């Protein structure tokens, strides 16, 4: 009888241990889940044409919702501002030029190659890869979570994505899939969750 009681006791203790570990792991995962859901929303904006066209992996910017190469063979240049004969601000002024359809914003330039969000075939990088780049201080100009939130909330070229003006044909450019307010809220939720990134390549 006693051996049976000991066996039952061991089974009970083992079951209790497994349950406790499972609950602990579940509770540990819960805070990350909302953060990852928030990141999914952030990612949907970052890979929209208004953002990814200037976060290229190539030596040139892109244009349009189809993300074709910038006309006139405009190139990145040494600092992302073009080259002397085709400097970005030569055409892109501080605001949209509604009469010509040329978009504009303060300090118009390409994002650095360290912040590329697409591959050399012009395809968006995975959510995990973009998240790693966005959260890597060596690539993102040394921004931590709060600095990223401020950047998304106030940077002129980020704000431009929701006020992109008209195309040369007079039609309105598309905006990201979230409103700016929703984008900032998603970024804040992601930052408050500790900027978790999806697993994978």
Regions found by a protein language model. Give the residues of each.
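Short amphipathic alpha-helical surface micro-motifs
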Residues: 34-35, 70-71, 91
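Short, well-structured alpha-helical interface segments that form or flank functional binding sites
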Residues: 37, 49, 83-86, 182
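N-terminal, post-signal-peptide region of Sec/Tat-exported proteins
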Residues: 51-81
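N-terminal export/targeting leaders of redox proteins
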Residues: 1-43, 63, 76-79, 96-201
């Amino acid at each position: 009888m006693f051996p049976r009681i000991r066996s039952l006791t061991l089974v009970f203790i083992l079951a209790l241990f497994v349950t406790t570990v499972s609950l602990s792991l579940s509770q540990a995962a819960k805070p990350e889940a909302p953060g990852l859901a928030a990141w999914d929303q952030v990612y949907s904006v970052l890979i929209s044409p208004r953002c990814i066209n200037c976060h290229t992996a190539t030596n040139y910017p892109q244009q349009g919702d189809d993300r074709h190469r910038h006309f006139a063979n405009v190139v990145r240049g040494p600092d992302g501002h073009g080259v002397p004969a085709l400097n970005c601000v030569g055409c892109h002024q501080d605001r949209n030029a509604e009469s010509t359809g040329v978009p504009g914003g303060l300090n118009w330039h390409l994002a650095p190659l360290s912040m590329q969000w697409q591959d050399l075939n012009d395809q968006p990088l995975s959510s995990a890869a973009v998240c790693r780049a966005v959260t890597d201080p060596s690539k993102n100009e040394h921004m931590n979570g709060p600095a990223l939130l401020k950047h998304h909330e106030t940077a002129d070229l980020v704000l431009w994505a929701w006020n992109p003006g008209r195309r040369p044909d007079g039609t309105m450019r598309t905006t990201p899939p979230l409103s700016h307010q929703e984008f900032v809220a998603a970024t804040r939720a992601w930052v408050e969750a500790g900027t978790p990134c999806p697993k994978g390549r």
